[in-house]
C-alpha cells in the first residue's frame, strides 16, 4: 500500500507539470514606435534594452514597461550588448565622436568614456570596442580616422588600450613607416578570445597586425608592408613573428585553441595564392597543409568545432582564365592540431561562388553550410552553363562527417509549397542569408 502511494505521488508530480505545460500561454506585450529601432536582451534575465529615435530605453519586465535613459547625450550611432558579458554590460557609441557610454548593471546606471584621439584624427564614424572575456577593465578601442592624402581621402585608424576601464593610451605600431606618406592601419585583439581559451597568455596579451601601404600618383598600390606582433603588456612593447618577414599578412583570427593567419608571397597581386599558418600557443606558427591552392579566405567565416578542429570556407570568386570551368568552392576541416586540412564532401553540385558556414556554440557538433552561386562574366566563354549552379543549404550534426538537407516542417501549409516537403532529398529549405 505504501509503495502504491509512493508511485501515485511520483505520477502526480510528473503529470501536473505536463498539464501546466499544455496550458501555458506566453504573455505578449506591444510597444508602439514611429521609427525603426534596435532591440537587445541581457542574458539570463527579463531585462531588455532598445534604441528608438535616438533614445535608449530599458525594461526590467520583458518589455511590459519601459524607462528612458537620461544620462546619454549626443547622436547615438549604435547600441550593443557585450557579447562576452551579456548578463549585464552594454555599450552605446556616439556618431562622429570618440565618446561612448557603458553600463555594467543592465542599464540602471551609465558612465561616459572618451578615447583621446589625436588632433589630426577626423572620425568617419565612431570608435569600436573589443572586450576581454574575463576582465571587464581591459578594453581595446579602434578609431577610424579620415585623412587627406593629396586630395584623396584615406582611412587611417588609431588603436587604444585601457587596463583600468577608464583611461586609454595609444598603441604605437611597431612597424614603422618607410615613407612619410604611407597609410598605416592596425588591428588588435586579445589573445584570449573566450573564457575557456586554451591559448596561454596573461590578460594583457594582445595580438596586432600592423600594415603600411603606399600609392603612386595614379592611386595604384606601390608599396605594402605588414607585421604581426605579440604584446604581453597591453601594447606598450611588441615581439614580431619572424616567420612572416618576407610575406604579406592578409588577415588573422583568434579562436579558442588556435590562431589562424593567412599570408601571400606576392605583395602586389591580390589574386596570388594564400598560405594558412596555425599557432596553438601564440609563440610560434606552422604552415598548414592544404589540399589545393587557396585564393579566397575570409577570416570572419572561420570557426572551431567542439573537438578543436578548424573549419574554413573557401570561396571561388573568379574563374580560371585558362579554363572556363569554375574552380571549386569548398569547406575544409583540419585535424585536431589544425595543421592538415581536407575537403568535406557536403554536396555534389558544382561550386562557383561563396560559401558561408555557422557553427553555433549552443548546438555542439552542428555545422550549417550555405552556398551562394556567383558568376564571373569577364572570363565566361560560354562553356560553363550557369543554370546548374543553385543555392544550397545543408546541416551536419556530427562535426561534418555526414550532411543532410534542411527539412521543411509545416504540415498545415504543405499544399502551398511547389514541391513535396515530405521528401527533403528533393524539397528542402534553402536559406542563403541566415544568422546564428
Swiss-Prot record:
It is a single-pass membrane protein. One of its GO terms (cellular component) is Golgi apparatus. InterPro entries: Sialidase_sf (IPR036278), Sortilin_N (IPR031778), VPS10 (IPR006581), VPS10-sortilin (IPR050310), WD40/YVTN_repeat-like_dom_sf (IPR015943). The chain crosses the membrane at residues 1-21. SUPFAM superfamilies: Oligoxyloglucan reducing end-specific cellobiohydrolase, Sialidases. Glycans are attached at residue 157. The keyword Glycoprotein applies. Pfam families: Sortilin-Vps10 (PF15902). SMART domains: VPS10. Signal peptide: none annotated. GO terms for biological process: Golgi to endosome transport; Golgi to vacuole transport; protein targeting to vacuole. BNR repeats lie at residues 57-68, 101-112, 229-240, 394-405. It is found in: Membrane. Disulfide bonds: none annotated. Keywords: Glycoprotein, Membrane, Repeat, Transmembrane, Transmembrane helix. Its main location: membrane. The keyword Magnesium does not apply. This is Uncharacterized membrane glycoprotein YNR066C.
